Each structure stands twice: as structure tokens, then as C-alpha cells.
């Protein structure tokens, strides 16, 4: 079954309002084994909406439309669908009843302008809106079934779940396909390299698809399939997951789609370990990432942004002589920072960073992009020194934070 999504409204078209509805609908359809081919958006124009509906119905089995069902003059979707289907608008008893019930339950008066929402294309099947005034509807146009829903996200989600998807599942009948997918997360490789290593995917795994998404500095690889039975779909997704791990290598750190901070948290919980962080160049970003994970209070104990040298001395016990001799950005300094924060917090691990995020502050010996990472644990302190610059302060800070988290992750393996 092929589906398309049509969003209507000037505010959506102009970007004033983000179309979160399309993303939600696509995810629900994907889980039901339905292939979403296109997302389309048109403004509040009767002719444009009608033309889009006609065009989409010629190539899709199912069309899901959002927006334009309200009582105002710019709510044109119902009339546009009627025009595309060459149907007249008629008062639908079910739509009228659901609207009257809605107003009575809320002790409100139904205005004349509201009655417009009970006018549906002739032959349409009303889909009751349990939490709003505007009913939705389903209308067959040739081989395509059109489902029209409100644009208000919570109303759309409710209608999609209770009124639209059950009808679509009935339309699928015995021809339903079952979807399965897995998401793998990668750190430490550029997108181009990941793409090269995925080159043989289609030949090795017929019937599987993959997509690559970047959220710097992580890369997410989603493998997916649709099959006549759920067991086959799940088995193929598992095989694809193993293929990706083999081809991409140890840079794949999660096959559950976890971000690096979440994977580190999972490993800390598994090891019954705790962590404390001392940050200089990352400015609290590591702590923010770790505490953004639900349940992080089980393993995250303390964070100190010891940006100034004196703070490193006063809070963490770093020797002034170490800083004077080697500099704040040095493996010697982060060694003492990591050891100090571990001691102060009483944590299993102490993680520390010091570096030069830029755009200024670099030298020939320590250019912008230089970061030193220290990790103190029960078996001592390890340090590392890396120089990787994106000539962008925010990107450098984020990369530094992920390099530190990756150091901890590998220690926990």
C-alpha cells in the first residue's frame, strides 16, 4: 500500500508553523507496513488544494490530509476535496451530532459558523473528533481513499489512532505488510566513509532499505523492510544490523539507536558505576548531555566547570606547578583534574576536559581544536590528546564532549 501526506495552510507553507503532523503520521504508517512516498504542502487556496488532491489520488492508495477543517473563511480543505472528487457538500448527520454533543458537554453554544464543519462531501464517511469541533472524514476517489483530519496536532493524533488507522487496516485486508527496522549509531567516522562502507547493502540484502541521518558528530543508520509476516521482517532487520556492524566496524556503538550519552548511561548502570565530570573547554556540555538522559541520577554524581586556572586549583586540587609548567591544556593538567573530581565526588570515574575551542587562543604548539581528556578510575588515570578543528566554536565544543564520552564508553566495555 502506497501512502502520501498532504498538509494545508499558509502558516505551514511559510514555515511559521512547523509541520510536526507529517512526521508523526509517517512514523505510524511506517510501523503499519505502509510505504510513504511523498509529503506535500499547499497554502489556503481552494484550487491548489483540489489540484494536489487530484494529483496525489492518481498515484497513491491512501492520502492523509491535515488542516483546513475549521469554521473560518480560510478553512477550505473540505470544499477542495469535494471539488476534486466532483461531489457536492451535504449536511452529514453524524458530523452534526458529534459537534452538538461536543458543545453540549462543554456547556457552550454552537455558532452558525460552526455548522460549516458538519458539511461533508457527498458519500464521505464521518470520522468523529472526540476532542475538538471539526469532524474528519474518509472519501473514496477511484482506487485511492482520502482521509481528512484536523491540523491541530493533538486532535490529529487522536483521530489518526482511533478513527483513521483502524479503517486503513481494514483496507489492507490480507495484503498487509509488516514493517521492521533497526537503528545503529556511529561515532568517529565521517558521513562519506560510512556511505562508502554501506555501498554493498542492496546487493547483500535484497528487500532491505537503509537511510543515513547525521546529528553531529553522530551518524544514525536506519535499516528497514516490509514483509508479508512479522517474523521474516524481524529476521531480515536483524541480519541487516549484523551486516552493518561488520561493514562499518567498531565505530558502531549501539544497535538500538541510542545516542552516545544514553549508551554511556546504560553501561554505567550495567557496571553499577558512577561518574563525576570536571570541564573546562566544554563548559558543562558533558554534564548536560549525561543528565539529559532519564534516570541519570542513578550514576551521575557531580559536575564542575573549572574554567579558570584558579578554579582547577581550588576545587579539584590541581597543582599550580603543573599548570605553570605544562599549561592548562595539557595531559598533565587533565590527569589531575580527573583524579581530583573523582576524589571530590566519590565517584567510580572522574572525567575531565581542557582544550581550545576557538576561534582564537590557539598557538603553533596547541592550535584551535586541541583537546586533552583525562579519565580517572579504580585502576588509575588515562589521558589522551587530540587535535581536530571544525573552525567553529560550538562544533568543536560538541566534538570535544563526545570524544570524552567515547573515552568513558570504551573504558566501560
From Swiss-Prot:
One Pfam assignment: MoCF_biosynth
Gene3D superfamilies given in the database record: CinA-like, MoaB/Mog-like domain
InterPro entries noted in UniProt: CinA, CinA-like_C, CinA_C, CinA_KH, Competence-induced_CinA, MoaB/Mog-like_dom_sf, MoaB/Mog_dom
Source organism superkingdom: Bacteria
Similarity field: Belongs to the CinA family.
NCBIfam families cross-referenced by the UniProt entry: cinA_nterm, molyb_syn, PncC_domain, PRK00549.1
Name of protein: CinA-like protein
The organism of origin for this protein: Desulfosudis oleivorans (strain DSM 6200 / JCM 39069 / Hxd3) (Desulfococcus oleovorans)
Amino acid at each position: 500500500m502506497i501512502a502520501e501526506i498532504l498538509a494545508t495552510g499558509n502558516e505551514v507553507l511559510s514555515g511559521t508553523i512547523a509541520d510536526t503532523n507529517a512526521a508523526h503520521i509517517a512514523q505510524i504508517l511506517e510501523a503499519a507496513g505502509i510505504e510513504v512516498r511523498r509529503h506535500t504542502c499547499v497554502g489556503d487556496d481552494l484550487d491548489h488544494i483540489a489540484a494536489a488532491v487530484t494529483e496525489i489520488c492518481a498515484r497513491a492508495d491512501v492520502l492523509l490530509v491535515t488542516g483546513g477543517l475549521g469554521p473560518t473563511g480560510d478553512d477550505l480543505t473540505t470544499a477542495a476535496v469535494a471539488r476534486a472528487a466532483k461531489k457536492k457538500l451535504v449536511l452529514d448527520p453524524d458530523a452534526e451530532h458529534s459537534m452538538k454533543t461536543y458543545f453540549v458537554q462543554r456547556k457552550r453554544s454552537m455558532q452558525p459558523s460552526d455548522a460549516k464543519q458538519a458539511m461533508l462531501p457527498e458519500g464521505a464517511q464521518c470520522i468523529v473528533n472526540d476532542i475538538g469541533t471539526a469532524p474528519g472524514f474518509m472519501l473514496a476517489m477511484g482506487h485511492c481513499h482520502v482521509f481528512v483530519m484536523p491540523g491541530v496536532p493533538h486532535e490529529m493524533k487522536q483521530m489518526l489512532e482511533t478513527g483513521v488507522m483502524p479503517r486503513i487496516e481494514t483496507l489492507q485486508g490480507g495484503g498487509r505488510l509488516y514493517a521492521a527496522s533497526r537503528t545503529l549509531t556511529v561515532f568517529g567516522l565521517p558521513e562519506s566513509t560510512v556511505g562508502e562502507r554501506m555501498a554493498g547493502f542492496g546487493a547483500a540484502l535484497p528487500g532491505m532499505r537503509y537511510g543515513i541521518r547525521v546529528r553531529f558528530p553522530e551518524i544514525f543508520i536506519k535499516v528497514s523492510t516490509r514483509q508479508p509476516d512479522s517474523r521474516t521482517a524481524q529476521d531480515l532487520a536483524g541480519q541487516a544490523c549484523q551486516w552493518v556492524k561488520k561493514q562499518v566496524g567498531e565505530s558502531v556503538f549501539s544497535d538500538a539507536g541510542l545516542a552516545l550519552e544514553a549508551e554511556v548511561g546504560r553501561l554505567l548502570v550495567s557496571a553499577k558505576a558512577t561518574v563525576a565530570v570536571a570541564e573546562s573547554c566544554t563548559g558543562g556540555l558533558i554534564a548536560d548531555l549525561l543528565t539529559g538522559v532519564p534516570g541519570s541520577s542513578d550514576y551521575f554524581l557531580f559536575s564542575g566547570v573549572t574554567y579558570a586556572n584558579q578554579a582547577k586549583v581550588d576545587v579539584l586540587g590541581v597543582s599550580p606547578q603543573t599548570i605553570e609548567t605544562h599549561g592548562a591544556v595539557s595531559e598533565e593538567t587533565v590527569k589531575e583534574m580527573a583524579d581530583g573530581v573523582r576524589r571530590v565526588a566519590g565517584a567510580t570515574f572522574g572525567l575531565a576536559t581542557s582544550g581550545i575551542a576557538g576561534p582564537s587562543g590557539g598557538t603553533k604548539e596547541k592550535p584551535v581544536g586541541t583537546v586533552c581528556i583525562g579519565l580517572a578510575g579504580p585502576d588509575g588515570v588515562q589521558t589522551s590528546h587530540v587535535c581536530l578543528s571544525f573552525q567553529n566554536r560550538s562544533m568543536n565544543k560538541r566534538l570535544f564532549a563526545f570524544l570524552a564520552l567515547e573515552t568513558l564508553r570504551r573504558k566501560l566495555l
